[in-house]
Structure formats: C-alpha cells, structure tokens
Amino acid sequence: MNERITILSAYSFVNIIEPANLIPKLLLVGKKKYIRGTILLANEGFNSSFSGSYENVNIVLKQLIALTGSKDVNVKINYSPVHPFQKLKVRLKREIIAMNVKDLNVDVFKGHYIEPKDWDEFITKQNVILIDTRNEYEIDIGTFKSAINPRTETFKQFPAWVQQNHALLQGKKIAMFCTGGIRCEKSTSLLKSIGYNEVYHLKGGILQYLEDTHNKNNLWQGKCFVFDDRRAVADDLYPAEGYWLHR
C-alpha cells in the first residue's frame, strides 16, 4: 500500500532582509527531499504549501523557519492519496498575499482571533456581520451560512469593497474568514488601520475549522476551494469527489 502524501501549508509575517538569497537554498533542500509545491518569499514573510512524505515536509519547514528567522508560524497539515502539486516552485514576490495596500503593518494592526470551537457561537450572535474574504469562484462551491459575498475576482479588489461598504460595516462586530487564515491577517489589519475596532477572524481559516469541529452544526455549506490539483476538499479535508484537476 502506498504511503499517503502529506500536504503542509505554512505562513509567517516576518521581516526578511534579502528574500531572493533564500531561493537557491530552499530549492536545494526541497528537491533533495522530493518536495512539490510553492513557496512564496517577500520582505514581509513567506507563504507556502507543499507536499511529500511527512518526514520530508517537516524537514523543509524547519529549514524555512531557520532561514527566515520566524518565531510565529501558522502551520496546517492534511493528507492526499497522491501529490496535489506538479513540481516545486520558490518565487520572489512583493507581497506573500497580494492586496496592494502600501505600508500595512499586520503586527501593529491585527484583528482578534476566534478559535474554531467558538466560531459557530460567535457568528450567530446579534450585531455580528460575517464576511467571506475569498474570491467569488471560491465562494461559489462553499461558504458559511449567511456570509456576505463581496463578489471579488481577486483579493486586490477587497479594499475597494470595504471603502464602498462603510455604511454596512459601521457599528458592527465584523467577523471574517478565508481558506487558511493568511488573507484575514491582512483584511483585519486593513479594517483596524482605518478605524474599525471590533474586527475578528477565524483562527486557522476554514481548513482548521473543519479539522477541529467537523462542521458539527452544519453552518459551513458546500466544499472548500484549495489552490492545488485537488481544487476542493470536503468536510473531512480529503479531496472532494469530482473536483480533482487531471493533467
């Protein structure tokens, strides 16, 4: 029986002085350990998702942490019967998640985390407005019940949606969610930076929520879009039937 493939996703907002210098080192260790996936590097940190054996993905993660000097890394692991990536790519970017807002400091302006176990209770309270920060093609296959769909095609359009919807947001407790948490680090930071105080986000995103709660209250409806060949995962975090991208 073949060993199942481990998929490790990790991100960290950490100041990297010369991120380009890390590319050959990460490619070397990644290829040596038969890793596939994508690692994005920028001055603001790293964002990655890669697959391989459980031992090898953790070796690459340790190297990534050591090279970047990160002290606070958000990590998620799930599994697949086969690799969901075709090859290893390490890329230099201006942002690890592109929103095109200059000088946004996610360490200074940070939303309040809501643990997955507390999420259902929180989002069903009065005066809480729930926003899906993902793109419309992701929301089309699954989202939380009663979540607002900003109808964006890219995350870069989200700041404009916020500017156009101050009347909707004013005076509310704002709860936001995304796939794995990284987009909400920036979306909550954006709202905090322009004066909203009661800004919250789902810690670890939809994937952590499904892992921790098993969607016991059925507030999550549909599948969760993912950016690899699986295209979508079900409540058990295994590839959703009928979505796999065959190359």
UniProtKB/Swiss-Prot annotation:
GO biological process, one term: tRNA modification
Superkingdom to which the source organism belongs: Bacteria
GO terms for MF: oxidoreductase activity, acting on paired donors, with incorporation or reduction of molecular oxygen
Catalytic activity: uridine(34) in tRNA + AH2 + O2 = 5-hydroxyuridine(34) in tRNA + A + H2O
SUPFAM superfamilies for the chain: Rhodanese/Cell cycle control phosphatase (SSF52821)
Enzyme class: oxidoreductase
Active-site feature positions: C178
Gene3D superfamilies on file: 3.30.70.100, Rhodanese-like domain
Keywords of the record: Oxidoreductase, tRNA processing
InterPro entries: Rhodanese-like_dom, Rhodanese-like_dom_sf, TrhO, TRHO_N
Domain (Rhodanese): residue spans on this chain: 124-218
Pfam family, one: Rhodanese
Enzyme Commission number, as recorded: 1.14.-.-
Similarity annotation: Belongs to the TrhO family.
Function, in words: Catalyzes oxygen-dependent 5-hydroxyuridine (ho5U) modification at position 34 in tRNAs.
HAMAP family tied to this protein: TrhO
Protein name, per record: tRNA uridine(34) hydroxylase
Source organism of this protein record: Rickettsia prowazekii (strain Madrid E)
